[in-house]
């Protein structure tokens, strides 16, 4: 059982009364030719790695290989503990976990590319925060991961998730869309609302360039993962409220791909423009003339 785009995905969900996560699981079992127990074990492992990557730096901060980040998640966690946080419990937790995951990645730790290493904090950041805030089970979070993977699959099939091809809008943008869609389903929303949230996310991040300082997946990547969970939360809230999304996900994904291909090479992961070529960034990485 396969689907080529969101329109087909939605049609199958409606005809068979399936959630996006249930349909994606069926696809995994048929197209991937894996037995249910093996598939479940693999998803258990994915969730285990996500939890470790999102929590370890909070308790044991480690400097990144490039030296540009390290300890940020703990600082935000400590600030949250003072009761002076601005974002509310859910978003504060999501930001902490997202930034911690990027610290794990940048210090050669094990992460789950979701869909890429540079955007690996967004999906686990928001889903783990939801789990703690709403007392969700691991099985429910795995359901969210199947939903998120459906959005990622469509993006990889019909566009790109690579910053080198489509800019940060394709990398952090798609990860944020995955998280938003999963959040909507976990909060009781429909497949239509999940896709609306994913479309809203991409609209909000359209045109974002990929400009890693020193060519490293550290800065501004970590901060953009934090922005990604905020974007996903906002988009999910909008969709769950019943606000209409004018542009379908398939069309929004095509727009992301078109804009990405029009970005100059300097703004697609080459570190030759944007944040990467500011004087302070050059001084920090000791790489620019």
Per-region residue spans from a language model:
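Alpha-helical support elements that line or immediately flank enzyme active sites
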Residues: 124-135, 180-188
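Glycine- and acidic-residue-rich phosphate-binding/metal-coordinating active-site segment common to enzymes
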Residues: 145, 151-164, 168-178, 183, ...
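Active-site-adjacent structural elements in folded domains
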Residues: 108-111, 161-167, 219
